[in-house]
């Protein structure tokens, strides 16, 4: 299946159903009071994280998602049915952003987590709501309020504990193959890896972590060179980055310049990402004598002004890879647990929160029984349901 990590969709919540104007009509009850029911609330749109999905490709072709409208009220004080909510399933790790306002709606980081993306409209009020001691036959009603409409940008960001950085052909895919069951394509030409790959490193029955391999970076990636920096976002959730450096690049380039180029591109993309814990890992030590490899590792580290510890491995032979994974596991376990923010269904603001209350409070009934075409009995006999009832609509969409 093609890997797609970005998509734009339009979500439309359902409008609220309108209230109705109706009067009780029964045998021996010639002058029944108002019994117009309220409408139903419109359905809302929710994003739901689903661990069975791993790409946003479906939303490249299915871009419009609309919840059900609330039903209108009926006579006999019958309330309209609420519109059904719509659930849009997305992969775990999806981030939703409003494209028009730039507002970050939230991250879906756990299976089953729900995020309200669009609030359904509020129901309209029937004329029974406007009955007062001085106005026994109100002809007012309100229509339902419109539901939210949003254009959302969905971004899938892989959930991994460890991220791999490096130039093309630095040995990232070979490393993830050697320490996990993942089998990304490996070849001796640049950009063999075109999409991110995940692997689970399992040290024992109780200790494991997830590692992410992304396509290699080259100098000028922030300006679009190579595959650009579009995949760096998949490292934003990682807790530690492993910067793999090829000691003997096939193109004869300088390892020091290559390493510095990666750091530069990382800082251009995101200073926050560049500030994450980063370990230097020198790969392909099997291509030279051990003393020569150690001297070269120290030379590169000194040229980068590296003050921390660094590691040397041979991914293809599995040399020192297990020891490195054990140290990574110990480091991850020493970090405090990240607080996962739960999405609140009520986070998304809705402009009609006090609409009904204000409508009823501001309503001024007209009981002067004059001829100014208001809500009193003006001789039009609007109780006969002749299709020409003159009633006042408080809210018009």
UniProtKB/Swiss-Prot annotation:
Coiled-coil stretches: none
Top class in the EC scheme: hydrolase
Signal peptide feature range: none
Keyword GTP-binding: yes
Stored PROSITE patterns: G_OBG, GTP1_OBG, OBG
Boundaries of every Obg domain copy: 1-159
One of the record's GO cellular component terms: cytoplasm
Pfam families to which the protein is assigned, alphabetical: GTP1_OBG (PF01018), MMR_HSR1 (PF01926)
Residues involved in Mg(2+) binding: 173, 193
Recorded superkingdom: Bacteria
Biased composition annotated in UniProt, kind: Gly residues: 33-43
Biased composition (Acidic residues): 361-389
GO terms, biological process: ribosome biogenesis
One term of GO molecular function: GTP binding
Residue ranges constituting the OBG-type G domain according to the UniProt record: 160-333
Protein EC: 3.6.5.-
Region named Disordered: 22-44, 359-389
Keyword terms, alphabetized: Cytoplasm, GTP-binding, Hydrolase, Magnesium, Metal-binding, Nucleotide-binding
Subcellular location per the Swiss-Prot or TrEMBL entry: Cytoplasm
Quaternary context: Monomer.
Known function: An essential GTPase which binds GTP, GDP and possibly (p)ppGpp with moderate affinity, with high nucleotide exchange rates and a fairly low GTP hydrolysis rate. Plays a role in control of the cell cycle, stress response, ribosome biogenesis and in those bacteria that undergo differentiation, in morphogenesis control.
NCBIfam families associated with the record: Obg_CgtA, PRK12297.1, PRK12299.1
Designated name of the protein: GTPase Obg
Organism: Pseudoalteromonas atlantica (strain T6c / ATCC BAA-1087)
Gene of this entry: obg
């Amino acid at each position: 299946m093609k890997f797609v990590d970005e998509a734009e969709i339009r979500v439309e919540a359902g409008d609220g159903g309108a209230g109705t104007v109706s009067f009780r009509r029964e045998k021996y009850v010639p002058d029944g009071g108002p019994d117009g029911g309220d409408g139903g609330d419109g359905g809302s749109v929710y994003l739901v994280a689903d661990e069975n999905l791993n790409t946003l490709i479906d939303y490249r072709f299915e871009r419009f998602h609309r919840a059900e409208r609330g039903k209108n009220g009926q006579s006999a004080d019958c309330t309209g049915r609420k519109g059904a909510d719509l659930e849009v399933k997305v992969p775990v790790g999806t981030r939703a952003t409003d494209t028009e306002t730039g507002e970050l709606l939230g991250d879906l980081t756990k299976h089953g987590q729900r995020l309200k993306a669009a609030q359904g409209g509020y129901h309209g009020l029937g004329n029974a709501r406007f009955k007062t001691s001085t106005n026994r036959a109100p002809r007012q009603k309100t229509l339902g309020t419109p539901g939210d409409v949003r254009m959302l940008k969905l971004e899938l960001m892989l959930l991994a504990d460890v991220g791999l950085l490096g130039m093309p052909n630095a040995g990232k895919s070979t490393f993830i193959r050697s320490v996990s069951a993942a089998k990304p394509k490996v070849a001796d030409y640049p950009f063999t890896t075109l999409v991110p790959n995940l692997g689970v490193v399992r040290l024992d029955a109780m200790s494991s972590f997830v590692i992410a391999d992304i396509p290699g970076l080259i100098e000028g990636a922030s300006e679009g060179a190579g595959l650009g920096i579009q995949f760096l976002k998949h490292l934003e959730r990682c807790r530690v980055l492993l910067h793999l450096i090829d000691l003997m690049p096939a193109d004869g380039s300088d390892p020091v310049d290559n390493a510095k180029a990666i750091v530069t591109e990382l800082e251009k993309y995101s200073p926050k990402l560049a500030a994450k814990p980063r370990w230097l890992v020198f790969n392909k030590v099997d291509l030279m004598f051990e003393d020569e490899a150690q001297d070269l590792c120290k030379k590169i580290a000194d040229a980068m002004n590296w003050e921390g510890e660094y590691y040397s491995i041979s991914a293809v032979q599995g040399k020192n890879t297990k020891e490195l994974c054990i140290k990574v596991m110990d480091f991850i376990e020493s970090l405090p647990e990240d607080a996962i923010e739960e999405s609140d269904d009520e986070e998304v603001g809705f402009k009609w929160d006090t609409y009904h209350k204000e409508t009823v409070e501001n309503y001024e009934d007209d009981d002067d029984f004059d001829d100014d075409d208001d809500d009193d009995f003006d001789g039009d006999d609007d109780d006969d349901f002749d299709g020409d009832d003159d009633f006042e609509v408080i809210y018009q969409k």
